[in-house]
Amino acid sequence: MKKISRKEYVSMYGPTTGDKVRLGDTDLILEVEHDCTTYGEEIKFGGGKTIRDGMGQTNSPSSHELDLVITNALIVDYTGIYKADIGIKNGKIHGIGKAGNKDLQDGVCNRLCVGPATEALAAEGLIVTAGGIDTHIHFISPQQIPTAFASGITTMIGGGTGPADGTNATTITPGRWNLKEMLRASEEYAMNLGYLGKGNVSFEPALIDQLEAGAIGFKIHEDWGSTPSAINHALNIADKYDVQVAIHTDTLNEAGCVEDTLEAIAGRTIHTFHTEGAGGGHAPDVIKMAGEFNILPASTNPTIPFTKNTEAEHMDMLMCHHLDKNIKEDVEFADSRIRPQTIAAEDKLHDMGIFSITSSDSQAMGRVGEVITRTWQTADKNKKEFGRLPEEKGDNDNFRIKRYISKYTINPAITHGISEYVGSVEVGKYADLVLWSPAFFGIKPNMIIKGGFIALSQMGDANASIPTPQPVYYREMFGHHGKAKFDTNITFVSQVAYENGIKHELGLQRVVLPVKNCRNITKKDLKFNDVTAHIEVNPETYKVKVDGNEVTSHAADKLSLAQLYNLF
């Protein structure tokens, strides 16, 4: 067999086992763990290449003939960092491994048949990740959806009804009628969507009614009263109906302190929003909750990574919660939530795997298009400050990369009961995939595939003779249009709503699927971010200790994935 140099191989097929790739302009270096190909039998599309009739393409279609093959992709996922062909059929990932013509080529997987019906997408030199999942969405404006989508987010979970004051402050779609209208409005968008009902209710029939109306769970928010009674009732119904509860705890400690909230939770699983506290929650020590086994702790992106500007911008952001900067008590309320010491600790807690999820808090103290970027900026800042993680093996950052990608893919999927459908690059899941050039990883995707169909891509002038002439910018592709979007996007609902036929009741055309397995999980089920610990906060200095050791980080004055890539 003719041999070629590693440099030539990479230029033709992308990096292979042992090759290293830098992510964007960060210091994060991945190493390809293994390559599923058979060397010498690689498939590649194009003139003089191998995906041709009677070569890499078979003449004998089978039940495993693919609709789309993504060739030579570098997959970055909690399951591994490896090279493979990805086969898509009927909108789902049908196989991962070596694709081609089994009649002629060695090593072709049974489920990866390239045939007459197969389209090809070349991923040589590109990284493929699962679409991101943002679980802290205030549905204030529908314009958030394409903004998030263009950043690589393919699932949004939260609540709201538009720019009402309740939605500006809380991620809640309250009541049957509001849920009905939001579920109907969801039909329009290339995005998986799920809505949280109001959990601030001490009357269980009202909670059940929202689940029957299609809510995927409950949100408890201090602006509606995060009392022990509301917490207990919401969790009682969540346990009965297998849905998740998210909580923004009581900043003012009016109905109790953090210990009282933990007592009301009583060891039951709950998803804590902005667990550091600047976004809201028991002052000054809500961060203690992150160490508990039953707490699924999330950050929102204004506080990560910690920079020299973080503290200053938060006061203005806090006013969105229907506060008035001219009212002394409102200013004191806001000021109680902004603690540089706990914000500084948050970055380190992410690096330790104690904080498990990243999210946005869209237009309500967070930026909906920056979840992915902020996650990788935090990873890079922590590597620069703290060095390699002790869990790393070999001269790479693979463990840290898996830890951080899990924070916005598989872990939010597990938390909200949708990991059977989305959240990772695994066979059987919907093909919600994001393609990245390594130089732009984490900041500007090349292309987004939604339910197996291209929905958004960087695209040049439509009047040009080829696809690439300037101006190149994100443009909606066919997956965004017509009835195709009904087949390739999911509306998530509770199991009771699904079983009662809510799709037919509301005349929904999109795929409708139930959430499940929300109550039989703990933090130990979260990938690469399952660390529990005893966390303390000094009530006077706000310094944070983990298992007796102080944790903090420096405020960065420069970040990766920032001005190098953006004009504004």
Curated annotation (Swiss-Prot):
Q: Give EC number(s), comma-separated.
A: 3.5.1.5
Report the co-factor binding details. Answer: Binds 2 nickel ions per subunit.
Recite the UniProt keywords alphabetically: Cytoplasm, Hydrolase, Metal-binding, Nickel
Q: Which Gene3D superfamilies does the UniProt entry name for this protein?
A: Metal-dependent hydrolases (3.20.20.140), Urease, subunit C, domain 1 (2.30.40.10)
The metabolic or biological pathway listed in the UniProt record of this protein is: Nitrogen metabolism; urea degradation; CO(2) and NH(3) from urea (urease route): step 1/1
How is this protein organized at the quaternary level?
Answer: Heterohexamer of 3 UreA (alpha) and 3 UreB (beta) subunits.
What is the protein name given in its UniProt record?
Urease subunit beta
Source organism per UniProt? Helicobacter heilmannii
Q: What is the lineage of its organism?
A: Bacteria, Pseudomonadati, Campylobacterota, Epsilonproteobacteria, Campylobacterales
